Amino acid sequence: MAPYRVVAVSEGLAERVRTSRKSPGYGHPAHSELATGYGPCRLCLRDFEVGVERRLLFTLDPFHGFETFPLPGPVFIHEEACDRYPEDAGFPPDLLSHDLTVAAYARGRVLRAEERVGAGEAEGAVGRLLARGDVDYLHVRDTEAGCYDFRIERA
């Protein structure tokens, strides 16, 4: 078991988007498309099967309910139901091959540090950033697109 928790979007949020076809908190229409890129799905944290799976694109504020200052952006989930990534399963295997940005925050959404990492380097960055006493949680983002992937908290 990892010394941290991987926090994907909630099943309730994903179901609301699938049912309403709207972005939570914004009401923007969710867009359905055949996957043209790898992803990942923000619920199961698996890469999409390009040209095979359908996905929903919608606006998400990853700080909603957690911090007051919003930072909305585009994210994807599978159009069909999938299982939420287990919080205690460690770093999502599909994302280990991605170029990622790991942002370290203190409460109040104060950015303390940020590391941009290549394939296979994410777990080291997570360990280094969580070892800092001034860091409360991490956000993992796709470096190329800048999109939010998931949050990491200490276990």
Give a label for each model feature.
Residues Y148-A155:
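C-terminal edge-of-domain segments
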Residues T143-C147:
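Short Gly/Ser/Thr- and Asp/Glu-enriched loop/turn motifs at secondary-structure junctions
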Residues T101-Y137, R141, R154:
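Short, hydrophobic/π-rich interface segment
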